[in-house]
Amino acid sequence: MRSVELDDGLVEWRGALGFDRSDDGLAPRRLPDWTRSRIPDLFVESMVRMSSGVRLAFTTDSDTIELDAQLTAFRFEGQPPMHHGVDVVLDGAVVAQEQTEGAQRFILDPITRGVTGFEPAEPWRLRWTGLGTATKRVEVWLPTNATTEIRSVRIDDAATIAATRSGSPSWVHYGSSISHCMEVVHPTETWPALVARSSGLELTSVALAGQCHLDQFVARTIRDLAPDFISVKVGINVINLDSMRERVFTPALHGFVDTIRERCPDTPFVLISPIFCPVAEDHPGPTAPKPDGKVRVFERSEVLAFGSLTLRRVRTIISEFVAQRRANGDANLHYVDGLTLFDAPDWESGDLPDDLHPNPVGYARMAERFAPQFTAIR
């Protein structure tokens, strides 16, 4: 087997906008390098470094492919480790799905998110053989819920490898953990990946768990990418952290869209409101986990709650926001109600186990429901 250079253009890093480099390997980042100084804390940084939606793409006639990766993840005290998955796609078809618990892992306090411990782990070695010697388009989808430092990619000694340049339309999606999909083990099964693969789109995911707060450095990133299609699913994190009240939310949303529209004035752009969350429908945040893993909200006086946002109010604001801007001439701005993707009956069916995040079945249902709406808009 011979090693393939990771940064000489033969391997395309789709969905990666920057890299962390070490003597051992290359780890993709999902925001460009210039944003490093804008990132406010280590938890945001860890979400940027997670490889949700990132895949290695190349063309090869190698019968065998090997990959070594060092995974870095976290878990909260008292919780079991997550499983991490890698999927292999040949000529558009998923042919292999691997998973492991073997990541080096930081242990975090569930309230403060401070680091309380560390669990070491060896690199993960993966090998796929019997792939055939015909030339094929390969995509290796990396884990949704870990930083993935690629140490080595190897192919057969006599095999050839070349870059695979996609001619598919580009789609950038920004959202919260419900778009990041850390609960999904297999990376081709996040709802954005399912939509992208079924719709023939090249996905770049800047969905950052817990961190969808309309940050301008994300808006500038999307603007500068100038994709063919844009979607933003916003609202739940604003309530989770109680980071904005109504006075701030609407202007922040205008500013976010205005920044993107500077370079993408006519790009089809979808704003998606939050899916169902029982505790926050009519009660403002912040939210926090209970000992049983479900989320809760907190009672407070009317004075302190004045102007706070609930999910029901956020949906109304976003719907009215889109209607206003369309009336002012932005005909390519569209609204999708998050309740059309996941509503109370889906929660009642058990597919929102912590009352906040769908399980893989719930995410698949979201993809099935969003894809036709997205197609109609495009």
Features from the language model and the residues they span:
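Serine-esterase "nucleophile elbow" of acetyl-processing enzymes
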Residues: Q79, G130-L131, V138-A226
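N-terminal secretory targeting modules
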Residues: M1-S170, P291, T375-R378
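Catalytic His-Asp segment of secreted/periplasmic serine-dependent ester chemistry enzymes
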Residues: C277-R378
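A general structural detector for well-ordered alpha-helical segments in enzyme core domains, enriched
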Residues: W191, F249-F256, V314-F321
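Oxyanion-hole/transition-state-stabilizing segment in secreted/luminal serine hydrolases
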Residues: V195, L214-E262, P274-E281, F298
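A short helix->loop->beta-strand "cap" motif at the edges of active sites that frequently abuts
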Residues: C264-F269
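A short, flexible beta-alpha/helix-coil linker loop
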Residues: I178-H180, I236-L241, G350
